[in-house]
Curated annotation (Swiss-Prot):
Pathway noted in the entry: Metabolic intermediate biosynthesis; chorismate biosynthesis; chorismate from D-erythrose 4-phosphate and phosphoenolpyruvate: step 3/7
InterPro entries: DHquinase_II, DHquinase_II_CS, DHquinase_II_sf
Gene name of the record: aroQ
Entry annotation: catalytic residues: 22 (proton acceptor), 97 (proton donor)
Stated name of the protein: 3-dehydroquinate dehydratase
Entry's family note: Belongs to the type-II 3-dehydroquinase family.
Native organism taxonomy: Bacteria, Bacillati, Bacillota, Bacilli, Bacillales
Length: 145
């Protein structure tokens, strides 16, 4: 099973940006941790971009994946183009957020993406990614048993 882990704007600053909100582990550290937690039959590919079009291109290329873990960062609350890209692909997408967006500023409470994702995991720190990975694995197994 192949899963794309796609991170959006400012996530390249993990470990340095607002560690009280996002923690002190870098994006590389997150990738390493997630790879350790992945079952042997799961292949993870990691991509990050601060540019909306690059995220859309990565989603378009996700036809070869069985699932996508997407942290679109601030684009979650604004991007209809990313929403449309999610709708255009067959791979199921889980929206993730490190912080609990519902406990933060009001503008972060609305997701333009959630309705076209199979689920949303928010507020569990970097564990949100592990939970999303396991959710995608179970979703895939349930569809292929």
């Amino acid at each position: 099973m192949r899963i794309l882990v796609l991170n959006g704007p400012n996530l390249n600053l993990l470990g340095r940006r607002e560690p009280d909100v996002y923690g002190d582990v870098s994006l590389k550290g997150l990738a390493a941790e997630l790879m350790l937690r992945a079952p042997e039959d799961v292949e993870l590919t990691f991509k990050q971009s601060n540019h909306e079009g690059d995220l859309i291109d990565a989603l378009h290329d996700a036809f070869d994946y069985e699932g996508v873990i997407l942290n679109a960062g601030a684009y979650t609350h604004t991007s209809i183009a990313i929403r449309d890209a999610i709708s255009a692909i067959a791979a199921p997408v889980v929206e993730v957020h490190i912080s609990n967006v519902h406990a933060r500023e009001t503008f972060r409470h609305e997701s333009k993406l959630a309705a076209v994702c199979i689920g949303v995991i928010t507020g569990f720190g970097l564990t949100s990614y592990t939970l999303a990975m396991h959710a995608l694995i179970e979703h895939w197994r349930n569809r292929h048993d």
